[in-house]
Structures are given as structure tokens and as C-alpha cells.
Amino acid sequence: MAEAYIVEAVRTPVGRRGGGLGAVHPADLGAHVLTALVARAGIDPAAVDDVVFGCLDAVGPQAGDIARTCWLAAGLPEEVPGVTVDRQCGSSQQAVHFAAQAVLSGTQDLVVAGGVQNMSQIPIAFASRQAAEPLGLTDGPFLGSTGWRARYGDQPVNQFTGAEMIAAKWGIGREEQEQFALGSHRRAVRAIDTGRFARETVPYGEVAVDEGPRRDTTPARMAALKPVLDGGTITAACSSQVSDGAAALLLASERAVRDHGLRPRARVHHLSVRGEDPIRMLSAPIPATAHALKRTGLTIDAIDLVEINEAFAPVVLAWLKETGADPEKVNVNGGAIALGHPLGATGARLMTTLLHELERTGGRYGLQTMCEGGGQANVTIIERL
């Protein structure tokens, strides 16, 4: 059976909104990790078959197939193509899936997968709101569709509403959310201070570490914040941060490993994606994880480490309740609440962190999943070699 191997994985530090990466052109962020990836892997970049990048809100500096632009901005060979993927927040995890599938199919041997996002320059959902308004398009991507309205009516399609629905369904109160968020910051600060991210991170200028983790946050400060929605439980403290960053991985076939003298660090054991209620939107990692475990015959206890995106605290807390996973194996170095969530780059960032942490701890299996717009979730299981 064919295999898809992960050979290398790197990322920028994650920048805070308006922080050290805020003024950097997104193509230059992507070029930075591509340059580092090629150098670390020691490959001839002309041997790469394709570059698959995730990116949302593809307008302005993120428009025009930014995967291709990043590669060219890095000064890499013009004959190598690039394609940009949008599966909402799971875009660069899907990029890894597409890269692995190309390798597994035997049609390609060396594929770069990754993602980039500069949310300081292009705000979230800009493409569906502000960019469309000058054209007189004010209904967003859903309400103007007669088929959508016939099926879902005029229910709000909103991530905050979805997070509140999860909190209500699984009985997750504000205090539980804030305790989880506090733990995310503490884990992230510990990871930075002990150098756990050093191998995976490529500094950009003076930005050498993730800017998001708050050393001084306290339960009292979190409790003082107002909910985003009236009468709700979700606050900024329990939500992922607006961020900038990029990440990239190199996937290779057995033939490429042999021909280029590469060292496989992990193999892709499983990849899948599932969907459910697009209004609740953010709970799809639960059925998607169950599906992946059933397909592989693995139990949740067999998974050594999990990276699940902390879009909102209830997303992870509901997933923990349903899967019975050990919280000490989940987001051990913090998550998006502390580290940030540069949308189209986050999937590749999570996979990069998962690979390096498996190597640090000696674990065998790592599972990555994340909630996505439209009520979807990717799941990837890798096996450290």
C-alpha cells in the first residue's frame, strides 16, 4: 500500500492583531515558511509537484491564488504551480489532506501543504461582507439563496451563536469556559518558556515567539468581560484570537523519500472530513472524530496527543465530554485561545505543532481536528516514525 510521509514542518510565530506581523504582506509570510521548509528538507525545489495553501478572505493582498504568489515571492522555481484552498478554518488542514491524497494516489511525489493569513490587514469575513457591499450584495453567502432559506429559514449563521448553542446543549457554563481558557494561556506560556516551540518556529524579523499568550491573565479579569451576545456566556477571553501567521509542511511518497534521501518523520495514518448542522456549525469535530476512530479501529485512548482548534472554549469542552479523551493529552501546549487563530494557516500550524510534540514526547499517534464554517470538521491521524 502506498504511504504519504511528512518530512518537514515549520511555522512562523503567530502574531497578535496589529502586532509584529501585522504590516507584513501575506505573500511574504508564506514565502518565509516556504524558504525555510525547502532549506530544512534539503530538496531541490524544482522537484516539488504542487503547493497547496489554505487562505480565507481571498481579497486584496490575499487574492489571486496566494499559494502561487507565496512560492514565487520566495524566489522558488516558476515551473512549480500552486493552488489555494478554502474550507473555512480547516483550509490548511484540508491542504494537508489534498497533498497526502495526491501522494497516496501515485500522481505526485513531493507536495507542499500549508496556509497563510493576515487578519490584521483583512478582517474575518471581509470577503462576504465589506467586499460585497459596494456591489449591492448585502445578504451574505446564505440568505439570498432560495434553497438555503427553504431548508434553514432565516436562522443566524454566526460562529458566536453556534458557540452559544454548544454551550447550552452540553451544559458548559461561563466559569468552566474561563478555567479552560486560563489553562490554555498557562500551557502556552510554559511551552514558550521551556523552548517547546523552538524547533518548529522560524522567526520573522524581531518576532521570535508567539505574541498571543497572556502571562498576566487571571480569573478575575476574565470574569469582568461582557459576553459577546446579550445573555450569553461567550466572551473574548473564551474565544480564539485574531492573528497573523503562516505554516508549511512537506509531504513525500516512498519514491521521493528514496530518490531525494529524505527522512520520514511521520506517516499519514488516516484522513477524513465530515459535516453536520451548519447552524450550530462548530460541533462537527465530535462526529468526525467518531468516524475517524471507527474507520481506523483505534480507540481514543490509543491516541497519544490531540490538537483540536480552540475556536471557542465550548468547542473543545464538548468534544472532551463526548469522546472521553484525557484532557492531559489535548492541546498540551495551549491552543488558539492563547496562541491565536490565523484562519487559513491554523490547520497547518496545528499539524506542525502536533508532529514536533510527538517527537518530543515519544508518542506514536497524534490526532488533529477542528471546527469549520458550514458545520464541517477534518480529522487527520498521523503516526510518528
Each model region followed by its residue ranges:
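Flexible glycine-/small-residue-enriched beta->alpha junction loops
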Residues: L110-M165
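Conserved beta-ketoacyl condensing-enzyme motif
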Residues: G22-V111, V116-P134, T201-V209, I279, ...
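Active-site-proximal alpha-helical scaffold in enzymes
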Residues: R87-Q117, A167-R196, A248-R255, P342-T361, ...
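Short, well-ordered amphipathic alpha-helical segments that serve as non-catalytic structural scaffolds
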Residues: A27-G42, I66-C70, A95, Q159-I166, ...
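Active-site pocket-lining segment
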Residues: G162-E164, F197-E200, Y204, H269-A338
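Condensing-enzyme catalytic core mediating Claisen C-C bond formation in acyl metabolism
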Residues: M1-H25, A36, A220-S283, P287, ...
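N-terminal extracellular/periplasmic Venus flytrap/periplasmic-binding protein-like
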Residues: R11-T12, A23-A27, A31-H32, R40, ...
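Conserved catalytic cysteine-centered active-site region
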Residues: V24, C55-D109, G153-Q159, D216-Q241, ...
